């Protein structure tokens, strides 16, 4: 798809594989039951769009940006989010996540302060690196094999979350909330033995 401008449009049941969206702008659009597999964004923007029951796998980006996207009941796999950040003081790529499954996603140097991940989301095999995550809410979230590396997690809530690995030596954790028995895994980086 090339040089297309869409505002306030609704797209339902579309399936794209290997498609390159070049010089396209999507503003305030809704995508329902759509599939995007190994697609690319090239000089394309998505602004304040909503995705419902969509699957996005292996998204690639060149000189593109996404802002304030809402995802509900979506499967997001193998996405590196940092290249999708807007330059300057624009909103972050993700506005809300609800009942979503995120697998093998990478989030680098992103702002998730006060973000609520607890709305029925599952985050598997993903990485948060050098992210701002103060007051983020992961309460009850399945975080199987998800890592937090050098993140600011002050006052973040991990109670009843499971499967996470936190770099406690490189992350800021003051007043973060954890629950047992999962919190014992935080000690792994200290190379100590508990008995």
Language model features with spans:
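Tandem repeat scaffolds
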Residues: 1-195
